[in-house]
């Protein structure tokens, strides 16, 4: 369930924003490690158990919910406290838009909790690494990309672009999973066509800056 993770992601963002005095990121974007961190915290459930649409829409639309998240989160910052009522409001907000969280559920004839279901999948988040390719930092070293979606300040291993693509191709051809993070707000991304493009001229221009 994507939205099971998204709910925990927003809770983590709210906490981060509070301790940053309102200077955190309460937007909808994040990176792959956000999923891993939430998975380790709360586990996971199947999509059929928690589809995350508890409002009148066929598709996910968090525009209204995010406005309320910002209002509640920034109110706590201004008041410099998070009261018991604050936590109730936050959880009620997510229950209203995403649905109530399941404590237990039955899947394919077996009963699970979110944590026990995660354990049954045999996934170790420590087995996954994050790679990136930026020209303003040294290659073959880790650094924390300075982008808003990296609000958790996680580090990634920086590779030349061609080598990063070689690693991705090798992983896929040998049966491993690759999760690709991209900026869907860029002009080259098309939801309609399901593709993302970067012009060769644009790419080389950035490499020579």
Annotated model-derived regions:
Residues 1-200:
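Structured alpha-helical subdomains that flank or immediately precede key functional sites
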């Amino acid at each position: 369930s994507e939205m099971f993770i998204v709910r925990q992601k927003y809770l983590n963002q709210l906490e981060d924003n509070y301790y940053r005095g309102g200077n955190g990121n309460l937007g909808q974007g994040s990176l792959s490690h956000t999923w891993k961190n939430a998975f380790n915290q709360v586990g996971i459930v199947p999509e059929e158990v928690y589809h995350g649409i508890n409002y009148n829409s066929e598709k996910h639309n968090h525009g209204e919910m995010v406005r309320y998240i910002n209002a509640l989160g920034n109110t706590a910052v201004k008041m410099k406290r998070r009261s018991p009522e604050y936590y109730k409001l936050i959880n009620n907000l997510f229950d209203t838009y995403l649905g109530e969280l399941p404590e237990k559920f039955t899947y394919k004839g077996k009963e699970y909790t979110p944590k026990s279901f995660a354990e049954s999948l045999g996934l170790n988040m420590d087995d996954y690494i994050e790679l990136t390719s930026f020209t303003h930092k040294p290659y073959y070293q880790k650094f924390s990309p300075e982008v808003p979606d990296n609000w958790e300040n996680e580090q990634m291993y920086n590779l030349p672009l061609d080598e990063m693509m070689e690693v991705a191709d090798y992983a896929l051809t040998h049966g491993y999973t690759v999760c690709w993070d991209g900026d869907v707000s860029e002009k080259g991304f098309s939801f309609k066509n399901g593709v993302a493009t970067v012009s060769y001229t644009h790419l080389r221009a950035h490499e020579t800056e």
